Amino acid sequence: MDVNPTLLFLKEPAQNAISTTFPYTGDPPYSHGTGTGYTMDTVNRTHQYSEKGKWTTNTETGAPQLNPIDGPLPEDNEPSGYAQQDCVLEAMAFLEESHPGIFENSCLETMEVVQQTRVDRLTQGRKTYDWTLNRNQPAATALANTIEVFRSNGLTANESGRLIDFLKDVMESMDKEEMEITTHFQRKRRVRDNMTKKMVTQRTIGKKKQRVNKRSYLIRALTLNTMTKDAERGKLKRRAIATPGMQIRGFVYFVETLARSICEKLEQSGLPVGGNEKKAKLANVVRKMMTNSQDTELSFTITGDNTKWNENQNPRMFLAMITYITKNQPEWFRNILSIAPIMFSNKMARLGKGYMFESKRMKLRTQIPAEMLASIDLKYFNESTRKKIEKIRPLLIDGTASLSPGMMMGMFNMLSTVLGVSILNLGQKKYTKTTYWWDGLQSSDDFALIVNAPNHEGIQAGVDRFYRTCKLVGINMSKKKSYINRTGTFEFTSFFYRYGFVANFSMELPSFGVSGINESADMSIGVTVIKNNMINNDLGPATAQMALQLFIKDYRYTYRCHRGHTQIQTRRSFELKKLWEQTRSKAGLFVSDGGPNLYNIRNLHIPEVCLKWELMDEDYQGRLCNPLNPFVSHKEIESVNNAVVMPAHGPAKSMEYDAVATTHSWIPKRNRSILNTSQRGILEDEQMYQKCCNLFEKFFPSSSYRRPVGISSMVEAMVSRARIDARIDFESGRIKKEEFSEIMKICSTIEELRRQK
């Protein structure tokens, strides 16, 4: 059936069709090659915005540092990072005056978190800069490596498993004259292959000990590794993002915990809530402004955009904010929170992989690592790269660039939101002391500003005052990219408001379709996405029904599981036809086994195996869900699993879907090619780590293992737990005497082995 798309819009107001203009269908652009150029851009731009600041040299690392705080007040509209410290402190004081006790209470909440958080909090997150190997690793591996190095250097506070004790080790490590680390390296040898008699390169992985002096260690500890941000839609140029190492992460986590606690209490903050809760919060602020602007007042809203938010923020500013927020708090607490901004004031940006050169004539390729950029002859580079390198050279140390000003993306989202809200807070009439007043919403660098005044001149004056106040704390509202409208129509964090929020359905488009996990999960995720969009995003019944039919079609093409009686010939159709013919109750077959689709918009919440169970032949049931069938997934059956879905905007969301283990919930194996690379040693470490953690969780279901288990090691804890459990099971008659004594014997053997080691 062909539809003329223009007909769809005849009865729609333009705002409701906004979502069709978004660049969200199709694959997003990915970056290839090195991010070195983008990182140099960031470093150079950040310094340019603060160029009138004071230069100093870090006594420990010798890095040149630029401090723009209390720099000259701006004379034009160019973005600048010259925040005035007294202005920031005053904004904080007024914020506290409007919300009595807010800082005090948040500090108390945070203090509790600080004392309870376990070091395993740092294992969350995919890529983390691993300073021991000088490259990115999964967070769990990077943490394990760091703790291992600390331990071999006599730092043992972290054995107790509290994050705060790990951070004590980090502080101590910075005072050490040198650190000994273990690095992986690979040797290449040319050997003759016995089978083919050809020469092949054989790689072996070795571990070697290396000593790092205080200066080099500090540089590594303060380094943020950089990568290119992938999958950004609607941009022509890519940009660099940073991933900090384990030394910085824990401190940042506590600062963000404090800031999050403050944001939760601020009605203008778009963080940390999301989804419908966020929409409700925003609608409240708009309602307040519109009710107050009765017939006498005009009300306008700016859909705001800030120029280079991160690059104009300054860690020194955040230090001042934290010092103010934690006044009257215990010394240890103030110290632990001030470390993150201090480390960021001294941060180094790693320039990434460097540049790749190739000669067409000689068919040669060579990599110029970032470390060489300081000394290489610039005649090899093109004009723009040459300029970048010349500019960054004074800042380079060991392949990293000193980057004192600026924040790097996504590090202090909550704290910078507090700063933004403190300026919105100054819009109350008691502070503006005139006829105009403002309020608004802030979520990291995105804001919406609502200004009320008796006439247009007042609105203009209010906007100007807001603009200038922002400049004083290093926030640069972009006059080119912000636009103003009568209140009632604006956009904030990709929510479009028109007398209420319009569903921006296109944002969800990328998450429709077949995920490619396995037949069982894909079916479940597919219908859950449709269900969720009916609940949250105005997906109407007719469209949902159509989405469902398209999904089933897509699913059948992906897994080549067309109906059993189809004429389509695929590699699977021969087997599926046989199954179809020998099945009595054909309605009971899974869609992925050539069965019919029984889903409609009323039963999307039911897993397929439950939906069809009563309709299945008995032997089909027996094959699908029999734990003795080697193809049934042997993971414990959890009622829900988490899938990662990619909305078009913002980070990947985790979405729950029902998981029932059947023969279709298989798990694909890891790609073998990694086993031949230098990553292999790391992979083995990671698997060991994974196995130990899984084993530990078997002994201590999550409820009991989150709490500190005293000073005993993991093995001791597991052995004693095994003994207790075995005794209980034996006394209650769940296990026989022979089994009980066997368990006890194994426990003793393990302890014996530990003693010998």
Curated annotation (Swiss-Prot):
Catalytic activity: RNA(n) + a ribonucleoside 5'-triphosphate = RNA(n+1) + diphosphate
Gene Ontology terms describing biological process: DNA-templated transcription; symbiont-mediated suppression of host gene expression; symbiont-mediated suppression of host mRNA transcription via inhibition of RNA polymerase II activity; viral RNA genome replication; viral transcription
RdRp catalytic domain span: 286-483
Region (Disordered): 50-81
GO cellular component term of the entry, any: host cell nucleus
Keyword Nucleotidyltransferase: yes
Keywords: Eukaryotic host gene expression shutoff by virus, Eukaryotic host transcription shutoff by virus, Host cytoplasm, Host gene expression shutoff by virus, Host nucleus, Host-virus interaction, Inhibition of host RNA polymerase II by virus, Nucleotide-binding, Nucleotidyltransferase, Phosphoprotein, RNA-directed RNA polymerase, Transferase, Viral RNA replication, Viral transcription
Positions of the UniProt region annotated as Promoter-binding site: 249-256
Subunit and interaction comment: Influenza RNA polymerase is composed of three subunits: PB1, PB2 and PA. Interacts (via N-terminus) with PA (via C-terminus). Interacts (via C-terminus) with PB2 (via N-terminus); this interaction is essential for transcription initiation.
Protein name listed in UniProt: RNA-directed RNA polymerase catalytic subunit
Species whose genome carries this gene: Influenza A virus (strain A/Swine/Colorado/1/1977 H3N2)
